[in-house]
Design a protein with these regions (language model features):
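Histidine-acidic metal/acid-base catalytic patches
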Residues: 5-6, 25-44, 48-64, 71, ...
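Helix-loop segments that flank and shape redox-cofactor active sites
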Residues: 138
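Solvent-exposed N-terminal domain segments of exported/luminal and surface proteins
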Residues: 5-27
Length: 257
């Protein structure tokens, strides 16, 4: 919800606020059933998210709404899929239309689609020596009425066994996985290192209320030093990159983050 959250030390990073995202979902996107979804999700977090949203609504301005749309739809979707451009005049309406494409799609259907796709491309991967690596859902929990299928140990285990071929592997994104309090990052790394073909070295810190932010390379829930040891031991030639993290001292203009 905030792509340039300011930290006390002067750096900035990504910050995910459940109340702000729920406000966006309910009052800006106006998604059908959003209030019920967030009420249920709040109970899982032991938070009154609908109450927080009601209080937030009292202070949100038109400019605040515009910034949320810019962060959640324009910049994020433009980066991930390219479906929404920076100069899009009706980003909210277009985003609604894109979400409708998945209306009624269940987790089981998404899993079967994934299995179908991976099974279909394995012969080509084997022929040309290519290794596919699935990136975990980010964030690793259902949002916007969409099911998620790569969020935890059980999900990873499922897709690796559904298409049990060494060319079907995992992108171990420590940042995405560590944003979920249900994930033990070191345990996952040890379990799936042999089927991991790419590593994103990033760490998230989860606050007591469930909100999360990107942490420094020595902080957060993902022990990046231990992760490097685990993957280097199993596969010394495994591609790893630090991924985006805290922006400081002009990094933003150089593309480091």
């Amino acid at each position: 919800t905030d792509l340039l959250h300011e930290n006390p030390n002067g750096s900035s990073n990504l910050y995910f606020s459940f109340s702000e995202f729920a406000y966006f979902d309910i009052y800006i996107l106006k998604r059908e059933g959003a209030d019920k979804d967030w009420d249920a999700f709040g109970k899982r977090l032991n938070r009154d998210i609908l109450g927080e949203v009601a209080e937030l609504k009292k202070t949100m301005t038109a400019d605040d709404d515009r910034k949320l749309v810019e962060n959640i739809i324009v910049k994020t979707q433009g980066f991930v899929s390219g479906n929404i451009k920076e100069d899009e005049e009706r980003p909210v309406e277009l985003f609604r239309e894109l979400l409708l494409l998945y209306k009624g799609v269940t987790k089981e259907q998404l899993r079967e689609n994934m299995k179908y796709f991976l099974s279909a491309i394995m012969p080509t991967c084997e022929e040309y020596g290519m290794f596919m690596c699935v990136h975990p859902d980010d964030p690793p929990f259902p949002i916007l009425g969409l099911p998620r299928i790569v969020t935890c140990d059980e999900d990873i285990d499922w897709f690796l066994h559904a298409v049990d071929n060494p060319h079907n592997g995992l992108t171990f994104c420590a940042g995405s996985l560590s944003a979920g309090g249900h994930n033990d990052i070191i345990k996952l790394a040890n379990k799936y290192a042999e089927r991991t073909w790419f590593v994103h070295m990033r760490s998230c810190h989860i606050f007591p209320n469930g909100d999360f932010t990107e942490a420094s390379h020595l902080g957060g829930r993902a022990d990046l030093i231990e992760l490097a040891r685990i993957f280097e031991k199993v596969n010394p030639n495994l591609p790893m990159r630090v991924d985006h993290g805290m922006t400081m001292l002009g990094d933003e203009n150089r593309g480091y983050n």
